[in-house]
A protein has these predicted regions:
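N-terminal alpha/beta PP-like core and its mobile active-site loop of ThDP/TPP-dependent enzymes
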Residues: 1-206
Length: 206
């Protein structure tokens, strides 16, 4: 029999596996499955806040103090836009920060319809934050959760650290995923040291 679980539970278990101890959140309709999963996950403290900006700033402060990835969870629409300031702060200060936002169901996304908004409280948050994050994506397939989470953690913590953003539609949060069949993210091989090549070039020039 295939072992499945909710996408939201997979995300919570992934965070625990990466050593995350606390998630700062404001529950909402757009992230209800994720909020439930964070509250139920063993080893993970769900820290409710009064405002999404406070979530992002608290997660950024957590990152500074612990030298680990800080995690904030917000809902869709204004919940997501309220967290932008925290992402901007983490970008400027080079802090590894993961912001997870809820999103309307995939069927309610405006896509290329020409509409500015289709689903209730829908905002294209990914386009808004691309300029201040190292990685920002709306997860369109639950089986890609592992790939996006691994890539986000890798980019947040390597090179110059910084914020990353995952936008997760409601039907992926609450829908079944099969972890054993998920693809992972393989970081690109590090570039070969340039010192020897540079020395050889200088030698040829001289």
């Amino acid at each position: 029999m295939t072992n499945t679980l909710r996408g939201a539970d997979y995300i919570a278990e992934f965070l625990v596996g990466r050593g995350v101890k606390s998630v700062f959140l404001v529950p909402g309709g757009g992230n209800m499955f994720l909020s439930d999963a964070m509250g139920q996950a063993a080893g993970l403290e769900a820290v409710p806040m009064h405002h999404e900006q406070a979530c992002a700033m608290a997660a950024e402060a957590y990152s500074r103090v612990t030298e680990q990835v800080g995690v904030a969870l917000v809902t869709s629409g204004p919940g997501a836009t309220n967290a932008i300031t925290g992402a901007g702060e983490a970008w400027a200060e080079s802090c590894p920060l993961l912001i997870i936002s809820g999103q309307v169901k995939r069927a309610d996304l405006k896509g290329d319809s020409g509409l500015r908004q289709k689903g209730p409280q829908e905002v294209d948050i990914v386009e808004m934050v691309k300029g201040m994050t190292k990685y920002a994506v709306t997860v369109m397939d639950g089986q890609d959760l592992r790939y996006h989470l691994e890539k986000a953690f890798h980019l947040a913590t390597t090179g110059r650290p910084g914020p990353v953003w995952l936008d997760v539609p409601l039907d992926i949060q609450g829908g079944p995923v099969e972890p054993a069949a998920m693809r992972g993210f393989t970081p690109p091989a590090p570039a070969a040291p340039l010192r020897a090549a540079a020395a050889r070039m200088i030698e040829l020039i001289n």
